Amino acid sequence: AEVVALVTVGDWLEEELITGRTFFRTTVQKVYKGDIPHEFVLAQEGCSTWTYRNYPVFTYGNQLLLFLIKYDVSMYRDTYDLVEYPDAYELISTYSTVMYVTQDDSGMSYVLDALGVMTEWSQINQPTDCPAVAHPGQEQLLQIRDNLTKQDPVLAAIAPSQADPDRPVASPGDLYRLTDLEDYFARLSADYT
């Protein structure tokens, strides 16, 4: 990824039915890797007529931890007349790198790995180095699910509904503490400098 950032999805700008993309104005809350404008355009694969694996199109106010690359329309330029956004970025690997951010009532931030891909990757690559899946208590879990529902009702269906320390990891809906991921990103940055 060129950029790893915590962002908030803003206004819907347009959709391109030809490419199956939707564009949103997006605000950066924090950058963990790379350089990106404070406000940029997020190109998401999916639109009103088609979604990737039935995964929902983002909505206003979604807080996301994203792994991004610069959006490149050059493969469409010769065939279609498209609006170009010079400050547009898109998800690397479509949805496998989308992580929704939410909080419990104490303000602790959690990241929902909606597809379980991060957990699966971390187990294969460097299990001792990667952050552990968080296992919040039942009360915290209900708060997290409630806050996810406020962002998007579909998200609450993905999050675990029972506090279960024996729940299999690498499952859709794994939760991580944002602070654990930030520490992990800092260690990765130190390793590559």
Where are each of the predicted segments found?
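Residues that flank catalytic or metal-binding motifs in active/ligand-binding sites
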Residues: 3, 22, 62
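Netrin-like (NTR/C345C) domain of secreted extracellular proteins
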Residues: 47, 51-193
